Amino acid sequence: MLQIIYRLPFLWIASLILVLAQPTLCQAKMVSVELVWNLGQAGWVQIDIEKGDYQLSMDTVTRKFPAGSTLQVGWGGWTPVLRINHEEFQIFSGSVLEIKGINSGSLRVKTPEGKEAAYRGGLQLNWQDGHWRLVNQVDSEDYLKGVVPIEMSNEWAKGGSEALKAQAVAARTYLVKQTDNGSKMITDSPDIHQAYAGMSVEGEASKAIEATRGEIIVDAQTEQPIDALYSSHSGGYAEDAKNVWGNTDIHNVSHPDPYSQGVGGAVNYWRFIVSAPLLGSKFGLGPVRDVKLDKFPSGRVKSVKLEDEFGQTATVKGRAFVQAFYPFGQPIRKEAFLGSFFEAQAVVKSDSHGISDSAGLFGSFGYSGFLELARPNQQEQGPLLSKVLSSSLGTSAAPQPFGVFIFEGRGWGHGVGMSQWGAYHMAQLGYKYQEIIAYYYNHVSISKG
């Protein structure tokens, strides 16, 4: 609470600076977004024109492509083929197909695997290395309508609209920074750039984009766009950019973030359990007997030193350690390893009787699936953990004579810049988006076109 009170004057002064900053022009423009998140390496694709008027360009040939038109592209014997409006398939001898928008509309992309999404703007299809490369060409403000709802949530408009506005400004700034650096294209992947899902996720967040149209975050002195970084949940402490990527950034510095405490459900507090043998096998060791953490001032783990039962050691960078257990492609839950803000605790073996949970660590956290393990005698207190593999893999048929390790953590993501859950909490407390931006980014102002 003292931290919150301490920062309130700063928020008021910083927000005043943001409001009084001299506006500069940030025009909407067309951007090219490569669709790699769900449509990368596509072999067969169908594009349906849902609304508007388009034209289909195939090298030197152009034809009208109005609403109701369909294009199917695929390959046969490593040769690209296409079919227009359910006509006969034909071999495509060129390398680029382009569906250009004449009037505003929308098109839907489908794959045989059941993946589909609707997009504004046009679509370019390139045949490369035995697959189709899809690029959505869309107005930058329309692009944001497919970013903000999936980076945050349309549901946050109820009581958290100022957070959506802050996200819109940050996402717009990120886009400007990426494209102004000479890159002509970004991707729709959150692992590479920022998440983008087209029209399929549009909703209440569009109002936040319209309300902040053209606004970006710039350096207070140079008025150049900053790296407006953000992640889901800071765990209660924003990280310094140099501790994650090695580059000093005066706009993204470490500081306490009490607004991210107590919110976020599973990402606010999580616990991951793994057996000593499985932990060691991930890093070329035998069953681990000791874990030592080297931390940054924020509390995030810089590196992990592991020692196994044979005296062998390995030191792993914090991010690499997280990636070894991160639940890629799985729903986020509190029994997962979600970030580098964590503590480690060993539960050692109990003589000849295996490993017991006398403290009730599993039961209190909902690991009911681990509580059915047989006990060697009735006097053993608590369920045995000797059959546990990990929180994600469950148990094995045979027990192991070594311990298990419990990793308890906070937050989700790299923690640099704006915490999305923290921004949402601030909005719920009545802060405006300018104040949210001033809190999470250092030495900035907002430019408005």
Task: For each feature predicted by the language model, list its residue ranges.
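Conserved, single-site charged/polar hotspot
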Residues: 2-449
